[in-house]
Regions:
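Flexible, acidic loop-helix segments that line cofactor/substrate-binding pockets
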Residues: 14-32, 146, 188-191, 198, ...
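Hydrophobic residues in well-ordered beta-strands that form the structural core
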Residues: 110-111, 142, 185-187
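ALDH superfamily catalytic-core signature
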Residues: 126-131, 155-157, 166-242
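N-terminal Rossmann-like NAD(P)+-binding subdomain of aldehyde/semialdehyde dehydrogenases
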Residues: 1-65
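A structured beta-alpha segment of the ubiquitous adenosine-cofactor-binding alpha/beta core
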Residues: 70-71, 138-159
Length: 242
């Protein structure tokens, strides 16, 4: 229901997205890619029972006579998911994360990057006004959130997307260590694209290489985790690539 609702009003977000400095393609990835994440997780939810747990896989016999067995089950956390997000995808960054915790029945506190938080706020306002989610299941903090993880408990989850330096600082918070809080970090990455020696001009592989490198360098001005930052090309093909 949430995915369908957001898809029906998606055009509302494009004008404000442009004010973040995003091109139409950038906005399309952020807005419709984010909503697509909600659709994907909604489909995944259909694979789970309407129970507060999910039996994962088959029983594993651990003793000769079956007196000792093992069986995994999935259960939701009993706390809250705190999502600290990056500036480059104010909608996608939030939707891809909250889709997971909402599927598990876990509420979320979202802290978007201050510089583009107004776009996240618009999306959250539309979600809240729709009354599709239970009251309080999605909360937003714009601006400074200093101390946001200083009071987390064992059942809470913290996710962070941003720079490695900030992520390491958060990860070292004594409270996270003391309470064994789950911390997931997506930080700086160094991605490369490698052109094979047989991928010469005129081949589909060469054309795809040029297309993807150009796209990854220009979408969001290269400010995203999957951007190609190193291009490795056989010496004999350097001139063709240039």
């Amino acid at each position: 229901a949430l995915a369908l609702h957001l898809h029906s009003i998606k055009n509302k977000f494009y004008a404000l997205s442009a004010q973040t400095g995003a091109t139409k393609v950038d906005s399309w990835i952020d807005i419709e890619g984010g909503i697509g994440n909600v659709f994907a997780n909604a489909s995944l939810r259909k694979n789970f029972p309407d129970l507060p747990y999910h039996v994962d896989g088959d029983m594993a016999p651990l003793s000769k006579n079956g007196t000792f067995i093992g069986h995994h089950i999935m259960m939701p956390r009993e706390g809250v998911a705190i999502h600290i997000n990056a500036f480059n995808f104010p909608i996608w960054g939030m939707l891809e994360k909250i889709s997971v915790n909402l599927m598990a029945g876990v509420p979320a506190i979202v802290k978007p990057a201050t510089i583009t938080c107004y776009l996240t706020e618009m999306m959250v306002r539309e979600i809240v006004d729709s009354e599709i989610l239970p009251e309080g299941s999605l909360q937003l903090i714009c601006g400074s959130a200093r101390g946001i993880i200083d009071n987390v408990e064992t059942g809470d989850i913290v996710t962070f997307t941003g720079s490695a330096s900030t992520g390491m600082m958060l990860k070292a918070n004594p409270r996270l260590i003391e309470k064994a809080v789950s911390f997931n970090m997506e930080a700086d990455s160094l991605n490369c694209s490698v052109l094979g020696e047989d991928a010469v001009p005129g081949t589909a592989e060469f054309d795809l290489f040029i297309k993807e490198v150009q796209r990854e360098m220009t979408v969001k001005a290269g400010q995203k985790c999957t951007a190609v930052r190193r291009i490795i090309v056989p010496e004999k093909l350097v001139e063709d690539v240039q």
